[in-house]
């Protein structure tokens, strides 16, 4: 499958390019990007959920692709991670 680069607030993530007819593709793409952002932060799921103030179960459901995550939420989280990494407060 072809790959494409997805840029979230300066974090570049390589994702598989999905068929447009696949109705679950967007949810899976966002879930994968969320996991990559968390890993970039250097935090565990538990630590990341506490740091964000998001219930662990909600974050877990987003990361596993079981619950749809709004793209604007993903962008806000990416923005926070990028800025905290830049300031040296995480990572």
Feature names for model-found ranges:
Residues 29-30, 54:
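Alpha-helix N-cap/N′ positions at the starts of helices
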Residues 1-28, 76-78, 83-91:
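N-terminal flexible/basic segments that precede or flank functional cores
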Residues 42-60:
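Short alpha-helical DNA-recognition segment
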Residues 66-78:
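Short, basic-rich loop-to-helix N-cap that marks the start of a DNA-contacting helix
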Residues 32-47, 76:
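Short basic helix-loop element that most often maps to the first helix and adjoining turn
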Residues 34, 52-53, 80-81:
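Secretory-pathway ectodomains
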């Amino acid at each position: 499958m072809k790959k494409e680069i997805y840029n979230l607030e300066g974090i570049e993530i390589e994702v598989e390019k999905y068929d447009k007819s696949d109705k679950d593709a967007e949810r899976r793409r966002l879930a994968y990007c969320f996991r990559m952002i968390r890993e970039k932060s250097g935090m565990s799921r538990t630590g990341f959920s506490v740091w964000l103030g998001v219930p662990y179960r909600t974050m877990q459901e987003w990361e596993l692709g079981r619950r749809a995550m709004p793209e604007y939420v993903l962008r806000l989280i990416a923005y926070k991670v990028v800025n905290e990494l830049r300031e040296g407060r995480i990572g």
